[in-house]
C-alpha cells in the first residue's frame, strides 16, 4: 500500500515488535510498496534489519468476512509458508516466528503483524512480462510439498470474496461509505449483468474442472513478477498471504495461457501433471472477480480519499469491464 493505515498507532507497532519478537526498533521507515498489505523497514538497536508487514483484517475479503476469520485465514497461509521453508524450500521467504512461535500476532482488533528477514534483492512489477525461468521449478516444488497442505486453507475452485459481490448486487441503497462509494456504485451498476455472467462462467468452469478430478495442491496464489525477488543467491518468492490448496493452474495462469505454452509444457515435464486449459481460464477469471470483491468491500465501507483508494476505484472500473475478454466463452 502507498499510504500507512490511518487508524494504526505507530507506537502500537513499536510495542508489538518489542513484545512479540524482542525487537527494540531504532528506526522504522514506511515502505510504500505492493498492494493489500502495509510494510515497514525496521532497523533494531543492534543493527539487525527486518521487514514488518501489517494487514488490515477488515480489508481481507478473500480471507474471511470478519476480522477473526481473516486472522485465522492469514495465520493458516503463513503457517503453510513456514512449513514449506522448514521442508527445505530455501526460496520461500517465510515469517520469522514470534517469541511464542507464532507466524503472526494481532495488533489491536483490526490488524495483524508478521515479521520477515530483510532480503536484499530486486523485484519486478506486477505488469512485467512473466519470466518463467526458475519460477516453474519453484512452483513445481511448492505443489509437490504434500506435508504442508495440512496447514493451508482450501480455496479450491471457488471465487474468494464472492459474498461481497452478491451483497453489492443486492444493495440498491446509495453507497455512502466514502468519496469513492457512489462512483463505485455507478460503475458496478452499469456492468451488473456482465458481472453476473462472469460469476456464472466461473461456476461452469469450476464444475467442469471438478468433474475431471483435477488434483489439488498447495499453491502460492500470486507468483507474479512483483512477488519474485532476484538475490545474489537466486530467485526467492515472497508474499505468502494468498497460500491455499487448489488446482495447480492457480499458480500457472500468469505464465501460460494454454497448455501448449512453454511454461505449461515445462511444468508437465517436471511434474508429470498435464495442465488444464479450462483451469487456466478459470483462475485468470477468478483473479479479476477476487479483486472486484476486495474493491467492493473497501469502497462500500467507510474510507477516505488517498492514493490507495483511488487505485482501488480504478481497479474496480477495470474489473467490471472485462466481459469482452471472455466473449468466446460467453457468446
Residue ranges and their predicted role:
Residues 23-45:
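ATP-binding glycine-rich phosphate-binding loop
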Residues 1-28:
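Juxta-kinase regulatory segment immediately upstream of eukaryotic protein kinase catalytic domains
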Residues 125-190, 216:
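A cross-family kinase active-site recognition segment
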Residues 219, 224-225:
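Canonical protein kinase catalytic loop motif
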Residues 218, 229-279:
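Active-site Asp-x-Gly
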Residues 45-154:
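ATP-binding pocket architecture of kinase catalytic cores
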Residues 2, 174-175, 179, 293-331:
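ATP/Mg2+ or Mg2+-diphosphate-binding catalytic cores
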Residues 56-60, 111-126, 147, 171-182, ...:
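A glycine-centered beta->alpha junction motif in the catalytic cores
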Amino acid at each position: 500500500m502507498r499510504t500507512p493505515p490511518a487508524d494504526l498507532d505507530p507506537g502500537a507497532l513499536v510495542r508489538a515488535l518489542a513484545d512479540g519478537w524482542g525487537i527494540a526498533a531504532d528506526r522504522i521507515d514506511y515502505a510504500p510498496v505492493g498492494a493489500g498489505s502495509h510494510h515497514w523497514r525496521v532497523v533494531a538497536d543492534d543493527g539487525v534489519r527486518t521487514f514488518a508487514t501489517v494487514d488490515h483484517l477488515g480489508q481481507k475479503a478473500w480471507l474471511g468476512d470478519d476480522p477473526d476469520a481473516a486472522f485465522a485465514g492469514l495465520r493458516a497461509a503463513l503457517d503453510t509458508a513456514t512449513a514449506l521453508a522448514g521442508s527445505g524450500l530455501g526460496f520461500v521467504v517465510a515469517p520469522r516466528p514470534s517469541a511464542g512461535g507464532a507466524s503472526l500476532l494481532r495488533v489491536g482488533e483490526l490488524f495483524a503483524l508478521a515479521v520477515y528477514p530483510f532480503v536484499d534483492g530486486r523485484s519486478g512489477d506486477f505488469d512485467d512480462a512473466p519470466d518463467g525461468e526458475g519460477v516453474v521449478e519453484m512452483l513445481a516444488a511448492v505443489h509437490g510439498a504434500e506435508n504442508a497442505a495440512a496447514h493451508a486453507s482450501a480455496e479450491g475452485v471457488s471465487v474468494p470474496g464472492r459474498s461481497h459481490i452478491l451483497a453489492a448486487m443486492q444493495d440498491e441503497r446509495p453507497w455512502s461509505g466514502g468519496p469513492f462509494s457512489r462512483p463505485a456504485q455507478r460503475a458496478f451498476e452499469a456492468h451488473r449483468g456482465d458481472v453476473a455472467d462472469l460469476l456464472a462462467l466461473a461456476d461452469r468452469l469450476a464444475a467442469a474442472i471438478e468433474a475431471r478430478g483435477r488434483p489439488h495442491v498447495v499453491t502460492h496464489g500470486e507468483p507474479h513478477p512483483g512477488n519474485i525477488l532476484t538475490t545474489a543467491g537466486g530467485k526467492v518468492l515472497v508474499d505468502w498471504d494468498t497460500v491455499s490448496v487448489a488446482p495447480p493452474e492457480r499458480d500457472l495462469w500468469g505464465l501460460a495461457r494454454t497448455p501448449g505454452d512453454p511454461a505449461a509444457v515445462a511444468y508437465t515435464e517436471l511434474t508429470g501433471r498435464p495442465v488444464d486449459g479450462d483451469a487456466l481460464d478459470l483462475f485468470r477469471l477468478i483473479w479479476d472477480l477476487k479483486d472486484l470483491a476486495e474493491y467492493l468491500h473497501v469502497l462500500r465501507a467507510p474510507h477516505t480519499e488517498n492514493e490507495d483508494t483511488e487505485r482501488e476505484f480504478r481497479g474496480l472500473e477495470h474489473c467490471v469491464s472485462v466481459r469482452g475478454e471472455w466473449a468466446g466463452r460467453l457468446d
